[in-house]
């Protein structure tokens, strides 16, 4: 087997601080913004010439918290309740022969360094990537070849995509508004509305928690309603 190495060209900076709660696919949370911090020498302005003419880009990145030794041919997709196996190449599981992720995101802005003219980073939305994730490459999204309206989705075509109603008390709502921007709150609600729990967890009285923007967001789910019940600073790790 021939080994190869990949160059890290940048890092993702965003509000997703742990794996639980991250959107399961890119594009599901249009309000969630992320910043791709570029590293030299890949931050040269010339490398980005013409990119601002594209509305969307592809990001190739590293499942940096999913590395493990050995190859497993099948995995249990959470959306199938965690009790059915599919071939790893028929899923987007992070546990792959090469831990490479692929996401299509909307390009919102290119930020330049005023002192040296280099690119500080890219502002994108719709990312499904953890904060601190290494990025390997950036490519433009080409509608004429990357979009396939006739495509079928295999086993995912039969999935019931949840859409929960997200609510909170007046006190919790006020606390959210003092901590986060309106865009961050809208992105949080988009994430929660998709039901971040694994498919095999359905305990109405259980309190769940996810790290978002440096805070522990705790919630319960009953029927089709998700209630944010606490917003707290995370405890010591």
Where are these regions (language model features)?
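Arg/Lys-rich, positively charged N-terminal/basic patches that mediate binding to nucleic acids
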Residues: 1-45, 51-53, 143-190, 206
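Short coil-to-beta-strand transition motifs
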Residues: 2-8, 95-105, 213
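Conserved positions in beta-strands of structured domains
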Residues: 13, 105-108
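Short, conserved beta-turn/loop elements at beta-strand boundaries and strand-helix junctions
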Residues: 17, 109-119
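Active-site-adjacent substructure of cysteine-protease-like catalytic cores
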Residues: 49-101, 200-204
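Flexible glycine-rich active-site/ligand-binding loops centered on an Asp-His dyad
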Residues: 120-157
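Enriched for short, Lys/Arg-rich terminal
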Residues: 130, 222-237
């Amino acid at each position: 087997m021939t080994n190869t190495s990949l160059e890290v060209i940048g890092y993702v900076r965003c509000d997703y601080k742990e794996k639980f709660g991250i959107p399961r696919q890119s594009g599901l949370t249009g309000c969630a913004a992320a910043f791709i911090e570029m590293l030299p020498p890949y931050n040269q302005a010339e490398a980005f010439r013409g990119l601002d003419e594209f509305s969307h880009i592809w990001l190739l990145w590293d499942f940096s918290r999913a590395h493990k030794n050995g190859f497993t041919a099948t995995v249990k997709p959470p959306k199938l309740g965690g009790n059915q196996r599919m071939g790893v190449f028929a899923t987007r599981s992070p546990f792959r022969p090469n831990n490479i992720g692929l996401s299509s995101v909307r390009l919102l802005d290119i930020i330049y360094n005023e002192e040296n003219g280099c690119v500080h980073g890219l502002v994108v939305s719709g990312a499904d990537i953890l904060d601190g994730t290494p990025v390997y490459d950036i490519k433009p999204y080409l509608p004429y070849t990357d979009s396939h309206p006739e495509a079928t989705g295999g086993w995912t075509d039969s999935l019931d995509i949840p859409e929960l109603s997200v609510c909170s008390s007046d006190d919790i709502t006020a606390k959210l508004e003092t901590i986060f921007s309106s865009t961050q709150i809208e992105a949080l609600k988009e994430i929660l509305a998709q039901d971040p729990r694994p498919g095999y967890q359905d305990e109405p009285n259980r309190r769940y928690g996810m790290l978002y923007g440096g805070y522990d967001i705790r919630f319960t789910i009953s029927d089709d309603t998700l209630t944010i019940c606490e917003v707290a600073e995370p405890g010591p790790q």
